């Protein structure tokens, strides 16, 4: 169970880092929002899901 929690936290940190860099780049590019809207929504949905997963796993571990 601890390994699953650690992997979920790592995935959350990695996704956060990717979104931290990717979102401003998409908004700064001329046609970025129109062409990458679905990718950003998917990344944001993944991030929200990982936040809930980490919370659930944390409550099971402690």
Swiss-Prot record:
It is a multi-pass membrane protein. It is found in: Plastid, Chloroplast thylakoid membrane. Its main location: plastid. The keyword Transmembrane helix applies. One of its GO terms (cellular component) is chloroplast thylakoid membrane. Pfam families: Ycf9. One of its GO terms (biological process) is photosynthesis. Keywords: Chloroplast, Membrane, Photosynthesis, Photosystem II, Plastid, Reaction center, Thylakoid, Transmembrane, Transmembrane helix. The chain crosses the membrane at residues 8-28, 41-61. May control the interaction of photosystem II (PSII) cores with the light-harvesting antenna, regulates electron flow through the 2 photosystem reaction centers. PSII is a light-driven water plastoquinone oxidoreductase, using light energy to abstract electrons from H(2)O, generating a proton gradient subsequently used for ATP formation. Belongs to the PsbZ family. PSII is composed of 1 copy each of membrane proteins PsbA, PsbB, PsbC, PsbD, PsbE, PsbF, PsbH, PsbI, PsbJ, PsbK, PsbL, PsbM, PsbT, PsbY, PsbZ, Psb30/Ycf12, at least 3 peripheral proteins of the oxygen-evolving complex and a large number of cofactors. It forms dimeric complexes. HAMAP family: PSII_PsbZ (MF_00644). PANTHER family: PHOTOSYSTEM II REACTION CENTER PROTEIN Z. This is Photosystem II reaction center protein Z. The gene is psbZ.
